[in-house]
């Protein structure tokens, strides 16, 4: 074992114990289903802001964006306004309103909110939303577990199967114990580690090249197109790429594991304060990723896998103990998303199906037990998926973000801002968003025309509007 791997092992064991300790503490405060799924609507500004943003990004924030910037150069900057636009939509137009309305109609999950808003006594909206959430989340979690297995393998040299099992059981441990309270607290810590790692490594990269001015000169010499705003592309190719990158932001309003975090906020002041914390976190994460990717053209020319740039730069530029902490940040990015997604997937079974659709009348403690059991079984199922055939999973996860974003994003916005939205319009919107995402991806239009989320989001919105107009006489008053 090398000095670095030995220190990383020690740091990880400490990290492992802290995560489980948080789960145990949170479990002692979990007394009802509302506690388990929404932390009794008690989350404060810093936890709400950073946990929601960290859980939305996964390893893409610390590996994918750095790799994209390395490959595309300065032209990759167009994903920054796209992502920040998503943050702005969520925090300025959704967070405060959905927290207030979800509390008024006693909604615990996103499916709850949609069904109760339209007073859908036939449970059609709940069933559709459960199918979409469950199918996307399970594939998403399976893919994330595969990623965490590869990360363990690369850092510790642990076999792939054992890596997935260790990483998966750690996440399941604290998620089962403390529910969303444990998930939010751990996501908060993991989000801080993520931003610390990216900021430190990017600044050290600039310093190693002699400062910003010297860095720009060296990058220009190493790769002249890296600092071009259009990345050397034709106007048509650049426009298509820019629209796709900007379109990423359309996915944020429809992510259930993010939206439910707003529902768990303590009050409206938490949302107002959290807005600026979340925007600051996002700006630091993505600007640092772009900066590091550009520096990578000089530090690691001809890198075979651009997504390896972040850990390679950390190992080369930082002292060994700090490198260990930064590499744990990669695991943190993945784990923060897995825990949130597995909890949302579990809520579709334990709360939406078992408690609501099957009408099982149980005590609070019994429902919590069923919820924890569901987390365990779904988590084990995701681990088995990750251990099996992964090519299908990774293909599916490419449009899982789009599928969730297009299915729920437009509908959430319509329910909050247009009173004429009907139950039939909601059904049409969710169905259209998911199907268009799937068809667009399968037919290859995402590569040849534009990112699938853009047309799927637009067509879902149109479906909600026109079907609602045609069925406006059937609008029901929301439950309270």
What are these regions (language model features)?
Residues 1-480:
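Membrane-embedded helix-loop-helix hairpins and adjacent transmembrane boundary segments
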């Amino acid at each position: 074992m090398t000095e670095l791997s030995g220190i990383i092992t020690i740091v990880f064991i400490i990290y492992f114990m802290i995560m489980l300790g948080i789960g145990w503490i949170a479990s002692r405060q979990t007394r009802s289903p509302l506690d388990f799924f929404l932390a009794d609507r008690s989350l404060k500004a810093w936890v709400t802001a950073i946990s929601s943003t960290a859980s939305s990004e996964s390893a893409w924030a610390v590996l994918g964006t750095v790799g994209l910037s390395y490959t595309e150069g300065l032209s990759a900057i167009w994903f920054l306004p796209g992502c920040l636009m998503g943050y702005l939509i969520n925090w300025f137009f959704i967070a405060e309103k959905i927290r207030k309305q979800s509390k008024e109609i006693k909604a615990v999950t996103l499916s709850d909110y949609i069904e109760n808003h339209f007073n859908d006594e036939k449970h059609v909206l709940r069933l559709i939303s459960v199918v979409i959430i469950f199918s996307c989340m399970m594939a998403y979690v399976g893919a994330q577990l595969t990623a965490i297995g590869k990360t363990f393998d690369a850092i510790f040299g642990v076999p792939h199967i054992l890596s997935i099992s260790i990483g998966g059981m750690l996440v399941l441990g604290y998620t089962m114990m403390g529910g969303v309270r444990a998930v939010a607290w751990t996501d908060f810590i993991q989000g801080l580690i993520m931003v610390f790692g990216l900021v430190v490594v990017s600044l050290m990269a600039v310093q190693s090249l002699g400062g910003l001015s010297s860095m720009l000169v060296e990058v220009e010499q190493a790769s002249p197109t890296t600092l071009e705003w259009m990345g050397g592309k034709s106007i048509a190719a650049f426009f298509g790429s820019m629209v796709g990158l900007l379109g990423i932001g359309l996915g944020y309003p429809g992510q259930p594991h993010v939206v439910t975090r707003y529902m768990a906020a303590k009050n409206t002041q938490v949302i107002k304060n959290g807005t600026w914390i979340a925007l600051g976190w996002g700006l630091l994460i993505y600007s640092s990723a772009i900066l590091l990717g550009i520096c990578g053209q000089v530090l690691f020319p001809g890198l075979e896998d651009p997504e390896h740039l972040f850990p390679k730069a950390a190992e080369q530029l930082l002292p060994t103990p700090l490198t260990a902490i930064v590499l744990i940040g990669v695991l943190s990015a993945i784990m923060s998303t897995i825990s949130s997604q597995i909890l949302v997937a579990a809520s579709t079974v334990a709360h939406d199906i078992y408690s609501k659709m099957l009408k099982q009348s149980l005590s609070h403690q019994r429902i919590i037990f069923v919820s924890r059991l569901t987390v365990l079984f779904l988590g084990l199922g995701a681990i088995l998926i990750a251990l099996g055939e992964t090519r299908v999973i990774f293909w599916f996860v490419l449009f899982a973000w789009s599928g969730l974003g297009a299915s729920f994003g437009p509908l959430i916005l319509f329910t909050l801002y247009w009173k004429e939205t009907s139950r039939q319009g909601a059904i049409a919107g969710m169905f259209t968003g998911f199907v268009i995402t799937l068809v667009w991806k399968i037919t290859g239009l995402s590569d040849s025309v534009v990112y699938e989320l853009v047309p799927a989001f637009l067509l879902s919105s149109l479906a909600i509007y026109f079907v609602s107009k045609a069925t406006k006489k059937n609008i029901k008053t929301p439950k309270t």
